[in-house]
Amino acid sequence: MDVFMKGLSKAKEGVVAAAEKTKQGVAEAAGKTKEGVLYVGSKTKEGVVHGVATVAEKTKEQVTNVGGAVVTGVTAVAQKTVEGAGSIAAATGFVKKDQLGKNEEGAPQEGILEDMPVDPDNEAYEMPSEEGYQDYEPEA
């Protein structure tokens, strides 16, 4: 019985440690998101679009440190934060509304985080759909 109880105690310690790591990862992701939003706020009209992409990228980098179902929630929060940063930029006159959601080359930025393969159960990952990809044929 002692062996059984000791095993359960060790398992509990492992769960607590994993929860603490997840909590730490979420806190880091939130900190990076805040950094990115402050970065966007300090940019001029020309830099705002690039700044919004930076927020998304920093958040995406930190999301990889967070495991399990938390990833889905962090990704949703990050996307809403990026959308909010863009709205703030438009409201303050840093950028025109028609410039939001495009990178410096004018290509749409939507789907940055949505296409990231995420499995809350950590069982399997699927690649994003290939609808947006084109076949590449090298020139002879």
Swiss-Prot record:
Compositionally biased intervals (Acidic residues): 112-140
Tissue: Highly expressed in presynaptic terminals in the central nervous system. Expressed principally in brain.
Residue numbers spanned by region 4 X 11 AA tandem repeats of [EGS]-K-T-K-[EQ]-[GQ]-V-X(4): 20-67
Region feature Interaction with SERF1A, mapped onto this chain: 111-140
Binding site for Cu cation: 2, 50
Modification Phosphoserine, positions: 87, 129
Pfam family, any one: Synuclein
Keyword Magnesium: no
Residues covered by region (Disordered): 100-140
Effect in UniProt of substituting residue 50 to Q: In PARK1; no effect on protein structure; no effect on phosphorylation of the protein; no effect on membrane- and lipid-binding; increases oligomerization; increases fibril formation; increases secretion of the protein; impairs copper-binding
InterPro entries according to UniProt: Synuclein (IPR001058), Synuclein_alpha (IPR002460)
Posttranslational modification: Phosphorylated, predominantly on serine residues. Phosphorylation by CK1 appears to occur on residues distinct from the residue phosphorylated by other kinases. Phosphorylation of Ser-129 is selective and extensive in synucleinopathy lesions. In vitro, phosphorylation at Ser-129 promoted insoluble fibril formation. Phosphorylated on Tyr-125 by a PTK2B-dependent pathway upon osmotic stress.
Assigned protein family: Belongs to the synuclein family.
Disease: Genetic alterations of SNCA resulting in aberrant polymerization into fibrils, are associated with several neurodegenerative diseases (synucleinopathies). SNCA fibrillar aggregates represent the major non A-beta component of Alzheimer disease amyloid plaque, and a major component of Lewy body inclusions. They are also found within Lewy body (LB)-like intraneuronal inclusions, glial inclusions and axonal spheroids in neurodegeneration with brain iron accumulation type 1. Parkinson disease 1, autosomal dominant: A complex neurodegenerative disorder characterized by bradykinesia, resting tremor, muscular rigidity and postural instability. Additional features are characteristic postural abnormalities, dysautonomia, dystonic cramps, and dementia. The pathology of Parkinson disease involves the loss of dopaminergic neurons in the substantia nigra and the presence of Lewy bodies (intraneuronal accumulations of aggregated proteins), in surviving neurons in various areas of the brain.
Written domain comment of the UniProt record: The 'non A-beta component of Alzheimer disease amyloid plaque' domain (NAC domain) is involved in fibrils formation. The middle hydrophobic region forms the core of the filaments. The C-terminus may regulate aggregation and determine the diameter of the filaments.
Known function: Neuronal protein that plays several roles in synaptic activity such as regulation of synaptic vesicle trafficking and subsequent neurotransmitter release. Participates as a monomer in synaptic vesicle exocytosis by enhancing vesicle priming, fusion and dilation of exocytotic fusion pores. Mechanistically, acts by increasing local Ca(2+) release from microdomains which is essential for the enhancement of ATP-induced exocytosis.
Name listed for the protein in its UniProt record: Alpha-synuclein
Gene name of the encoded protein: SNCA
